[in-house]
């Protein structure tokens, strides 16, 4: 049997319990077709980069699968039919990773607090310029412009 990593996105308006029910449903499909599901991770509700089927957020779920290709095809067929699944992707892998996935360790942009120093870091000073005084941006009067050559 081949090893796969499978990720799917579920609609934002279903509950976390319904997402768990979807995972169990697809786990049952894999096991009914002679496969095994190892690690299951629910990454929670995350913002999408762009809208998918009028959704701005989605529930993400990851499954490590050890199954024959026919089981994967049947699971993907049922996902295409389901209105709750926005997208899915199955990738064949050499071996499953140990420990939590990188996405589980990564925090969503919405979960982060404010950055230190506001939007920008501290202002840098350059060695060849005098230090700027905040609020006073005048550097003296500008010299007169030279006449343009095309109008002379």
UniProtKB/Swiss-Prot annotation:
GO terms for cellular component: cytosolic small ribosomal subunit. Residues 96-152 are annotated as: Disordered. GO terms for molecular function: small ribosomal subunit rRNA binding; structural constituent of ribosome. GO terms for biological process: translation. Keywords: Ribonucleoprotein, Ribosomal protein, RNA-binding, rRNA-binding. NCBIfam families: S6. Belongs to the bacterial ribosomal protein bS6 family. Binds together with bS18 to 16S ribosomal RNA. This is Small ribosomal subunit protein bS6. It comes from Rhizobium etli (strain ATCC 51251 / DSM 11541 / JCM 21823 / NBRC 15573 / CFN 42).
